[in-house]
């Protein structure tokens, strides 16, 4: 049903609501998964959006859907039908993820590791659903060697030519912070509460004890750092489907696409959109970036 309504297209950083997505028949992964979760929940099927903030082995990120079936969470693409659950284009990519999380409403009492708790939501760690994990741990110390309580610790992967924090934690009274991640290397950055003193280091996947980070004034940090970051090796989640199931799925996808194409055919053509934009004193090029149904 979701495939009949929506197909993939890139968009800007502001996520469309499910209604806007279905009106336009387009959505990027975050919008497709938001739409699919809304549809599943509307039918009484427990579902949640999961998200890897940044890949470790390639640029960009991804969001998809988990659905609760027979006492377990299973994954699927947002508007990407497959022959069975736990089959998607990202079976291999997800096995190389350093961090996958989900946001749930309220206080969470499930089995997953809690990353942070806000007023209305809890962020939980779902990485172990997709790849073996290990504990990435640090102890942050002040310049005098005492534990730095409340320091911010950013666990980062290299993506789009920057160190992007996939998770940020605060240290406890012992200066400790730790998170379960995939078996890859991380860049870790720590800073005190006033953000006046900082420290950074590389956390290798095979580190057997917490790394010690000693905070120093920002001006005293090294000018350069040589490093090598290795992402987790691929160990693709097995895709289990018979040839008959896959053939049946392909036929349904063709039918789904034909239904969506019929809806898209009702859209105003670009020429009409440009004329309307001029009439309403809008920028024509901007009007071409959005598709609006009748």
Q: Which residues fall in each region the model found?
A:
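Short, acidic Ser/Thr/Gly-rich low-complexity loop/linker segments typical of extracellular
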Residues: 159-180
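Secondary-structure boundary elements
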Residues: 1-24, 259-287, 291-294
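Short Pro-Gly-centered beta-turn/loop motif in secreted/extracellular proteins
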Residues: 70, 173-194, 203-207, 286
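Short, ordered, surface-exposed loop/turn motifs in non-cytosolic proteins
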Residues: 142-162, 183-185
């Amino acid at each position: 049903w979701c495939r009949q309504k929506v197909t993939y297209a890139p968009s800007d950083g502001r996520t469309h609501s499910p209604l806007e997505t279905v009106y336009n028949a387009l959505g990027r992964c975050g919008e497709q998964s938001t739409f699919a979760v809304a549809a599943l929940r509307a039918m009484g099927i427990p579902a949640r959006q999961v998200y890897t903030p940044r890949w470790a082995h390639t640029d960009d990120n991804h969001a998809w859907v988990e659905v609760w079936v027979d006492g377990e969470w299973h994954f699927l693409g947002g508007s990407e039908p497959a022959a069975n659950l736990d089959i998607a284009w990202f079976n291999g990519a997800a096995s190389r993820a350093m961090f996958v999380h989900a946001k749930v409403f309220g206080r969470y009492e499930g089995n997953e590791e809690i990353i942070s708790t806000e007023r209305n939501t809890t962020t939980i760690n779902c990485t172990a659903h997709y790849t073996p994990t290990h504990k990435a741990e640090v102890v942050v110390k002040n310049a005098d060697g005492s534990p730095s309580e409340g320091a911010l610790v950013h666990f980062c992967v290299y993506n789009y030519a920057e160190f992007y924090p996939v998770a940020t934690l605060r240290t406890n009274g012992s200066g400790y912070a730790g998170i379960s991640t995939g078996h890859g290397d991380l860049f870790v950055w720590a800073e005190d509460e006033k953000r006046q003193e900082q420290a950074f280091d590389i956390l290798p996947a095979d580190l057997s004890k917490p790394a010690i980070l000693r905070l120093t004034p920002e001006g005293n940090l090294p000018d350069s750092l040589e490093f090598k970051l290795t992402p987790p090796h691929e160990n693709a989640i097995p895709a289990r489907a018979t040839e008959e199931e896959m053939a049946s799925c392909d036929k349904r996808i063709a039918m789904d696409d034909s239904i969506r194409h019929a809806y898209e055919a009702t859209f105003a053509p670009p020429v009409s959109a440009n004329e309307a934009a001029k009439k309403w004193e809008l920028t024509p090029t901007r009007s071409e970036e959005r598709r609006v149904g009748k």
